[in-house]
Amino acid sequence: MRRLNFEKVVTRLVEFIKENAKQGVVIGISGGVDSATVAYLATKALGKDKILGLIMPYYENKDVEDAKLVAENLGIRYKIINIKPIVDTIQSSLDVALDRKSLGNIMARVRMVLLYSYANSLGRLVLGTSNRSEFLTGYFTKWGDGASDYAPLINIYKTEVWEVARIIGVPQSIVEKKPSAGLWEGQTDEDELGISYKLLDELLWRLVDLKMSKEEIANELNVSEEIVEHVEKLVKNSEHKRRLPIGPKVDDLIIEP
């Protein structure tokens, strides 16, 4: 895995937020390490008065307490909004059956609507919390948690986020908890991805950044080519999530007068 100077990484992330979000930000705080890290960085960059944290649970669990811990440690203003009535209303209005992944996508998009509603009313920007591991594998909801004005962690792998979090003082209990999108009880990122973040990041760095072949990666990491192919497939199949909608070109169809 690449070796970063994490002290300098923190400085650069803080400078990025300070330069691009002077008017203040709204952040969705889930109780996980990514959103906690962004909240800590933003507070360091802008001061606590320019941060609003939204805690938006669908069901009550320990994540809410962890999210409150982050906000209260930082002294930032925060609101707890129960999204269950909103999500359930949408679900009951549809004449199609939804599996739990589809329901999870609705939750993520409802949270996006709330974040932007507050950001618009306050004249602020939305800071995203996605990391590079999620971004490259498409492990986010399109127009949901993937939607933001700026994403400070977008080039920081998940295993690197843990290092940044430790440096800036995120509570150890949050750094060490199992990563979860909180979409349903017992859900974890690594179960859904089918691979640990530690191995995933090693594979992604070699596959995407170093552009090594599958054979080279498998040999270097002593893993099967099937695992490398699994990650490669995650990257390829989620390409549409990483770009704006596209359509066919028509410039060549101009009729000369």
From Swiss-Prot:
GO terms for cellular component: cytoplasm. Pathway: Cofactor biosynthesis; NAD(+) biosynthesis; NAD(+) from deamido-NAD(+) (ammonia route): step 1/1. Deamido-NAD(+) binds at residues 109, 142, 149, 240-241. GO terms for biological process: NAD biosynthetic process. ATP binds at residues 28-35, 129, 158, 180. One of its GO terms (molecular function) is glutaminase activity. Its EC number is 6.3.1.5. It comes from the Archaea. Gene3D superfamilies: HUPs. Mg(2+) binds at residues 34, 134. The keyword Ligase applies. It is an enzyme of class 6 (ligase). Catalyzes the ATP-dependent amidation of deamido-NAD to form NAD. Uses ammonia as a nitrogen source. Belongs to the NAD synthetase family. Homodimer. This is NH(3)-dependent NAD(+) synthetase. It comes from Pyrococcus furiosus (strain ATCC 43587 / DSM 3638 / JCM 8422 / Vc1). The gene is nadE.
